[in-house]
Amino acid sequence: MQTDIAIAQSAEILPITQIAEKAGLKPNEILPYGYDKAKIKLDPTISRKKDLGKLILVTSINPTPAGEGKSTVTVGLADALALAGKKTMIALREPSLGPVMGMKGGATGGGMSQVIPMADINLHFTGDFHALTAAHDTLAAVVDNSLQQGNPLNIDPRRIIWKRVLDINDRALRHITIGMGGPTSGVPREDGFDITVASELMAILTLSTDLMDLKARVARIVVGYTYDKVPVTVADLGVSGALAVLLKDAIMPNLVQTLAHTPAIIHGGPFANIAQGTNSILATKTALQLADYTVTEGGFGADLGGEKFLDVKVPILGKTPDTIVVVATVRALKHHGGVALADLNNENLTALAAGLENLGQHLKAMGRYGVPVVVAINRFSADTDSEIQAIKDYAQAFGAAAYTTTVWAEGGAGAQDLAAAVIEAADQEADYTPLYQPENEAIDKLNAIVTTIYGGLGVELSATAQKQLMAFKAQGWDKLPIIMAKTQYSFSDDPKRLGAPKDFVIHVREFVPKLGAGFLVAMTGSILTMPGLPKHPAALDIDIDETGKITGLF
């Protein structure tokens, strides 16, 4: 069986100018990055249609080590829609090097349902993440320089909340001391690193509507507090323009293609467990303006990327999904039902029935938004007909039809039934209802997410979090949308509680205000913003030969 990268390397790749033409972009509306990649210029005249196209949101059950193949289904579904004669585009996030070299892998799909050039996209791509890292760390350097140069803003070094970032999983950098080496080496203080995708700049990049909106959002970033506990912003430091300059190319969406030559826009990459987990507003909006159907996805499960797409991205995008597709696999559901990874290839209808409760909670959560929901069963070779039918019957009880897909092996041809169902569902009248209103109190928003989306009892705030909320109310920040930073493996904040637990509360240990992005991050459980490498990182399996051919990259 060929690896994903072997399939990608043997594929015919069309010139990016040809893909742009297929998408409806004129030659002067793109900036080619070589033969097979391009930036799409920020041009308000790109819109070719009076009405935006249909928006299909792909999400999934809680991920497991068994794999769900959400990105693979996303790509395969788009190719299937194209096969059905629909003008289709994909809008995905960019992969982070941390997981690529760590344990999760890339974000370009798999098998015959991939976006290409796969290796380039999973590695440095067009340099967006490097530009973002440089901008973020420039701001960090400016903060420390202000301390060194007499501290004119009266910044309290103990209350600086702007860490440094790196797009690599490196647990040793979570907590560090900087400014050592004497008076000429800066002011000593505690600091740390987050992974680049956790940067507020990444959230801003993906939520900005244009370059000036990005610059205005950057100016609102809070980097820390004075000795009098007054917020210090980028506007106070005077570098919003410089940071916007560093991001002027990164804000432009990236155009590539699938193996079947469906145009794909890949842009932005916030994780859904520590940020909003969606691709950029600009990428999605551009695709909607050009195509009849745009297929996009939310990171991790519907409890994270799905909820954040619907409650954080949709109000800015100004377009609700026309259909939500929830991806599930027999293997993952059996794992949620208690089956060990080594035994997932064996039929086990009892465990599957127990694990189906995880799917059920996601269907209830997505169904409450008033958008038609369809289930995609990503079929593996060991799945039995009885197991597949059990999922279909279960989903039907929630009013959601389920369809098997074999897109890894067959590409778009393996999702034709799913595509037909999505087309039919997208023609239904959606009645989108947000989970909460902007004027709701933060605690009410938190409880709505936990009780309605997660199926839990509510939230419990630490003393620190309670104190922060009181301070935020005084600042007028308490009505901002909520981003839950939570484990992706469970509805609860305990990654070991699989399935669909009910008797749990979510423990919020602290909040992180992200005024530039426009939300409050609720840090729950033991979630981290700088991952570590596993015992056997993926980097150990990646190699390159004398011809430049890469191996081991999935």
UniProtKB/Swiss-Prot annotation:
UniProt KW Ligase keyword: yes
GO molecular function: ATP binding; formate-tetrahydrofolate ligase activity
Pathway: One-carbon metabolism; tetrahydrofolate interconversion
GO biological process: tetrahydrofolate interconversion
Major enzyme class: ligase
Keywords for this protein: ATP-binding, Ligase, Nucleotide-binding, One-carbon metabolism
EC number: 6.3.4.3
ATP-binding listed as a keyword: yes
Source organism, top-level taxon: Bacteria
Family: Belongs to the formate--tetrahydrofolate ligase family.
Official protein name in the record: Formate--tetrahydrofolate ligase
Biological source species: Leuconostoc citreum (strain KM20)
